A protein has these predicted regions:
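Asp-based, Mg2+/Mn2+-dependent phosphohydrolase catalytic module
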Residues: 75, 83-117
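Conserved acidic, metal-coordinating active-site core of Asp-based
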Residues: 1-75, 84
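Hydrophobic/aromatic beta-strand patches that form the interior of the parallel beta-sheet core
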Residues: 61-63, 80, 97
Length: 117
């Protein structure tokens, strides 16, 4: 098992993790979170991919909208918060693009000439 999703609140995290070893909670909503192995969040995954391909942090872009995306946004050179992201994510991002519903990733990539249409 790599990940378990649970409906819970922050006040319940300690109780949920009681009796577990080498696990952490990464929340993506006020009432939901993922239980994952310790040191296996999105930021660590991004760092592993960058190291594998010999890329620098500045060569990477990440998009996110939930609390569980914050460490990923901080692990790359340009962290982009979706327009529908929670305020905490927007505050930690370098840039804010349009919402998911407005195809924010597509429009950001088009504006930055990362893709052509």
């Amino acid at each position: 098992i790599y990940q378990i999703m649970c409906a819970c609140r922050k006040e319940e995290y300690a109780q949920i993790l009681q009796g577990t070893e080498n696990t952490q909670i990464t929340a993506w909503w006020d009432k939901a979170a993922d239980i994952i192995p310790l040191n296996c969040g999105k930021g660590n995954a991004v760092n592993a991919v960058l190291n594998y391909y010999g890329l620098s942090k500045d060569e990477a872009i990440a998009f996110g909208d939930g609390r569980n995306d914050i460490e990923m946004l901080e692990a790359v050179g340009t962290g982009v918060a979706m327009g529908n992201a929670i305020d905490e994510v927007k505050a930690r991002a370098d840039v804010i693009c349009k919402s998911v519903e407005e195809d924010g990733v597509y429009h950001y990539c088009l504006e930055k000439k990362l893709i052509q249409c």
